[in-house]
Every structure is written in C-alpha cells, then in structure tokens.
Amino acid sequence: MVKEIYGTKVGMTQIFDEKGVAIPVTAIEVKPLTVVAKKTADKDGYNAIVVSFGEIKEKNANKPHKGIFAKAGVDVQKYLREIKVENVDEYEIGSKITVDTFTTEDSVDVQGTSKGKGFQGVIKRHGQHRGPMGHGSMYHRRPGSMGSKTSTILNLNVVKVDADKNVILVKGSIPGAKKSIVRVRKSVK
C-alpha cells in the first residue's frame, strides 16, 4: 500500500461544514502517478517503486530519462520519484496510482519548497531588534538569502478527496507557491 503521493499546489479556498463554520483549505491536484520501475531488497537493498508524473514533450527529455521510460514501455513524463513500499509485487509497471490512496479520516504531512524571498536583512530574516550597534556587540546575525528551503507541515487533516477532479483538500496552508510540487504522505507521528 502506497503511503505517499506527489501533486501540485493549486491554491487556498474555504469550504463550510455542516454547522456553517468556514474551514480554510488548500487544494492539491494529484494527477495519476505511473509506475515506471521497481527496486527490490535483493538487488537495491530496499523495496521501492519509481513513479512518474508531469507533462513534457518527448523532444525536451534527455536520453537517460527517455531510456527509463522506453524500458518501462510508457510515455515520457517530466518527474521521477521513488516511493518506499513493503511489497513491490503489488504493483505492475505501467499501472496508475490515484488520489484514492487517501480518505477523509487521514492525517497527512505535506512537504514542499517554501517561497523564496531573496536577499533579506536581519530584521526580516531573524526578527531582530536593532539593539546596540557598536562597542563590540557580538550577537548580530548576518543578512542573506531567505526562503526557498524544503519545509514540512505535519498532521494536516484531509477534508475532502475528489477522485473525479484528482484533488485533495487539506485543512490549513502548505509551503510553496501555486503550481509548486508537493509531497503528501500519511502522518508519521
């Protein structure tokens, strides 16, 4: 059984529960993942499946990338990711993994790349006050690049799973800009 999938962040909205209370949710679009290869404990030291997703023109893919898809006999896609599984025999090469992996009772962890802020000063980057400037102050952190780091939000509730539109709605916000790739996995804690 797969415990994680990959999708793209669509954006935030709100839905209303039975009592009329607004719930802020983030929509994640999960196109079906295609199983491209299997990794076994005998050959590779661990059990995993290699999945692909995302559209790309075949002429824009590099030769090693094309070779993986030619060996599997499936159409070329943009991204390749590994998902650890307990039993690789449950999956056939070319089969699809859909959004039905999750239900509304699940709690998930969402991992993505935070929005990049560029070069920022210490007040914005570290939340410092100006403090004493001279006379040998030794605690000043330095300005520098902020954001564009991998970030994980733990224990978000799945509010709705729409298999027809390939969308998961999770309660709250998740890291990243719109159209960024996110990893959704069942909570580990």
Where are these regions (language model features)?
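Extended basic (Lys/Arg/His-rich) segments that typically form rRNA-contacting surfaces
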Residues: 1-189
